[in-house]
Each structure stands twice: as C-alpha cells, then as structure tokens.
Amino acid sequence: MKFVLLFGVFLVTLFSYSSAEMLDDFDQAAEDELLSLIEKEEARAKECTPRFYDCSHDRHSCCRSELFKDVCTCFYPEGGDNEVCTCQQPKHLKYMEKAADKAKKFGGKIKKWFG
C-alpha cells in the first residue's frame, strides 16, 4: 500500500511539473507572438499618411486622430480632370472628438469639486 501511495505521489508531482513546463512554454509562445504583433503595429503606425496629405497610393493608410481614424476622401478639383485624394477627418467625427474633449474637461472639474 505504501508503494502505491508513493507511486501516486510521484505521478502527481511529475504531472504537475510537466504541466507547469507546458504552461511556461505556452506563455512564452504567447508572449513572443504578442511582441511580434506589437512590433508590426508600430511599424505600420509609422507608415500612416498624415491629414491633408495625398493618400491615392493607399486609401487605407490614413493616420488616426485622438479617437477616430481619418478617411481618405477623393474629389475632382474645379476645372481639373485628375482625381485628388487626401486624408481628412469627417465633420461629424470632428464634432464628436470636441464633445468628448469637453466631457473629459468637465469630468475633471467635477472630480476636483467632489474630491
């Protein structure tokens, strides 16, 4: 009976050690994957097209503003035959950002008042 009990304890210890090793390997793999995604995102973020610059080469490359991504808007200038595309912020998103800014400032004032 002692042998079975010791063998059982040995198996449980071995199983817990091996599962801990697998979890560590899994965590390391997940961490490496996350770091590679972050690096790709940083590289992609550097390639964005600023507001009011030409975005005809890639219409999805516009930079983000504080809350929303700018939109590539194309138009024909008066008297011209060539299409011009620039990154712009739609007016409704501009107003939403202003409202969010004012709400943040107002929230800060309320926080000051009530501590």
Swiss-Prot record:
Disulfide topology: C48-C63, C55-C72, C62-C87, C74-C85
InterPro entries in the record: Spider_toxin_CSTX_knottin, Spider_toxin_CSTX_Knottin_CS
Record carries keyword Secreted: yes
Signal peptide region: 1-20
Entries under Pfam families matching the protein: Toxin_35
The keyword ATP-binding is annotated on this UniProt entry: no
Tissue: Expressed by the venom gland.
Sorted UniProt keywords: Disulfide bond, Knottin, Secreted, Signal, Toxin
MF term (GO), any: toxin activity
Any Gene Ontology CC annotation: extracellular region
Cell location: Secreted
Origin: domain of life: Eukaryota
Residue ranges listed under propeptide: 21-44
Domain notes: The presence of a 'disulfide through disulfide knot' structurally defines this protein as a knottin.
Family to which the UniProt record says this protein belongs: Belongs to the neurotoxin 19 (CSTX) family. 01 subfamily.
Listed name of the protein: U3-lycotoxin-Ls1a
Organism: Lycosa singoriensis
